[in-house]
Amino acid sequence: MALNLAQSAAAAACFATAGDARRAASVVAMPSSSSSATTSLRMKRQAACEPVACRAVARHVAAAAASSRRNGVPVFVMMPLDTVSKCGSALNRRKAVAASLAALKSAGVEGIMVDVWWGIVESEGPGRYNFDGYVELMEMARKTGLKVQAVMSFHQCGGNVGDSVNIPLPRWVVEEMEKDNDLAYTDQWGRRNFEYISLGCDAMPVFKGRTPVECYTDFMRAFRDHFASFLGDTIVEIQVGMGPAGELRYPSYPESNGTWRFPGIGAFQCNDRYMRSSLKAAAEARGKPEWGHGGPTDAGGYNNWPEDTVFFRGDCGGWSTEYGEFFLSWYSQMLLEHGERVLSGATSVFGDGAGAKISVKVAGIHWHYGTRSHAPELTAGYYNTRHRDGYLPIARMLARHGAVLNFTCVEMRDHEQPQEAQCMPEALVRQVAAAARAAGVGLAGENALPRYDGTAHDQVVAAAADRAAEDRMVAFTYLRMGPDLFHPDNWRRFVAFVRRMSESGSPREAAESAAHGVAQATGSLVHEAAVALRS
């Protein structure tokens, strides 16, 4: 007979490992009745993991897992991008969400991450917020016993790696951007990018009397007030969106309409009138007004490589000249100041005992990392070169606000990437980890692309958990919940991965052996989740 959701989750908890189950069973108080028949019946029920006895076992296993996680790295799982309907009033695929959350809980996952889309919640007009669909999700997570990382997603969904749905910015925001195209990031050829409002107008009251930063802060305040009863208990982290894909960066490598293709260097985004005005003032203050007319004109196009350009070439390119230093310092400083402004708003909302930590995501731009100029990082706003650490200033900015640095591409290995593009994700992760450590901020991680194989899991465990306590990541968020995750083989490996993370790097073989019981116990539940997610 198929188990229902609660029974499946309880059964999985019982079978998390054979050893855990045996140890847990040994502490369950047995009845004092002298009736051997009654005792036998109760023992059979316990062995079958029926709720009457299994709850005690499950509580013991959960407590053991929680204790283990204190020494390891908690794992969260990203929800589908379209978890909440575009009208904001309901969950999409409610049955699939319920089954999926129960399965994740059974695997020992700490919680979920969900995008709280500005374009959904405030779509009807300024200050008109509809969180109904998210309330349903939070209640479901609380009932299941999962924590939540809530992402304040102030960007458009669509046009980036992994974007499977389209969720634009709020309609009233888009209307203002259509009236004034300079509210959008703009490249040197006049191409506009509507993924995220240009940081150049952060302090301009361009949205019906409000600045963009005020819009973001008001949204976060509305979220806090609406979910006050969940904060600190169920909602344990607020990730603050800072740019395209929710990352603190410029939209320098947009995939939409084939503009950019990996591993192109991207393009600077500083040609809207607000950015040009700032650049002009900075150039005049430097005593070089001729530098204030726009960004470099010899930096190539989106799909060039560094050596194709004059600006990014070798040691003698424009990036290493006095002008290059001036421009790149200004460009990266504008991004840092944007982060300061938005984080100041976030801490004013969530900083007074709200109970949830704040985090910011930084992009893992690993291609051409082995070159001197690090061109793709420069166009994205990270002034990181062979001779300069571009991540330490970001980490220090986050430290001033007590925020966690969330970094991507943790699953990648150098040799898996095209070597001709000098991709070095492992070295990049090490550099960012060192910057976080030096600045005294917590480092969390994500995988940049969906991976379900043991090799990727090994890499994450090595980078995040299998190290000295002070160097471990504070959390890892797994991309992403979907039918592929619930494929039987993928699921078994994932359960083992979660166990290894919680135990700070236990061997893969032992973890996979222990995960076999969970995979068996949750088979029907996982199948239900996979089928429902495909519907």
From Swiss-Prot:
Q: Which residues form the active site?
A: 247 (proton donor), 446 (proton acceptor)
Cite the residue span of the transit peptide: 1-36
Please provide, in alphabetical order, the Gene Ontology terms of the cellular component aspect for this entry.
Answer: chloroplast
Q: Does the keyword rRNA-binding apply?
A: no
Q: What is its EC number?
A: 3.2.1.2
Which superkingdom heads the taxonomic lineage of this protein's source?
Eukaryota
Q: What does this protein do?
A: Possesses beta-amylase activity in vitro. May be involved in cold resistance by mediating the accumulation of maltose upon freezing stress, thus contributing to the protection of membranes.
* Name the record gives this protein: Beta-amylase 1, chloroplastic
Task: Point out the gene that encodes the protein.
Answer: BAMY1
